[in-house]
Amino acid sequence: MLSLLALAMMQLPQNPSPMTDSTRDHVRVESRAVAGAHHNLSVGTLLVPYGRMATRPLVVHFHGEGNLVETVIHRWRDNAAVISVVAGGGSDVYAAAIGSGEKFRQLLAEGQQKCSCVFRPIYLTSFSAGYGAVREILRDPLSVERVDGVVLADSLHASYETGDKPGPVVPADLDSLFDFAKLAAEGSKRMLVTHSEVFPGTFASTTETADYLLTQLHLKRKAIMRWGALGMQQLSEAHLGNFHLLGFAGNTAPDHLDHFHAIYDWLKKL
């Protein structure tokens, strides 16, 4: 767990937060071995649950401990194939790991060969720095055609136009994510974005990038007070077509990690 927490918070240098939280439960999903065949791929590891299926849902997840990723996703569907990619800390590391949309499409072909099945639907999920890979994949139109939905679990950051001081976000850092959000809002794709209140200080927080997406989509948040998965406290939401944005309380590392453990719930809401 500590190793995942360390990976989760390692991106660009950020201002350390002294904040702690003892209000919310921060329930954790316990990692377990998921029954199935594991295959090492050119990027990441593929889990194919036992039992033959001609068509099988696939989740490609970026950033998190492999067994725990599989456990969390199988709370959503226990027949789903899972490709888990753990590349280290920092969005640039994940962008480099996937490299390009072409490499992603090759990864899908490699996985389908191992599975002896067709992957459908195909969902991308990321936590924390993992968004770097998702952003690169969605910059490739042919890969966008293959991807049915995206979940960003407290996992969308950008640089500031003012460098390491708070200011406007760099639009180019969010270009492909915004384009996919538009497709989801129009109904042809599905997208769910969650964010905490963690404020890194030296690069745009998930709240600031969420606000950017909402502005570009001409959407406004609705303030709410609702219990979420695993004891999380939801404070806001916005919906348009198949695009969903959920805002949650919390500015501590455990609050950030909540979003990873709740990925099964985000997939249900997708």
Residue ranges of each PLM-predicted region?
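Catalytic active-site module of serine/aspartate enzymes centered on a nucleophile-bearing elbow/loop
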Residues: 249, 256-270
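The feature captures the conserved acid-bearing segment of alpha/beta-hydrolase catalytic domains
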Residues: 151-254
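Alpha/beta-hydrolase fold nucleophile elbow
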Residues: 117-128, 150
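Glycine-rich nucleophile elbow surrounding the catalytic serine of serine-hydrolase chemistry
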Residues: 126-137
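A domain-start/cap signature at the N-terminus of enzymes
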Residues: 9-58, 231-233, 241
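Sec-dependent N-terminal signal peptides
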Residues: 1-10
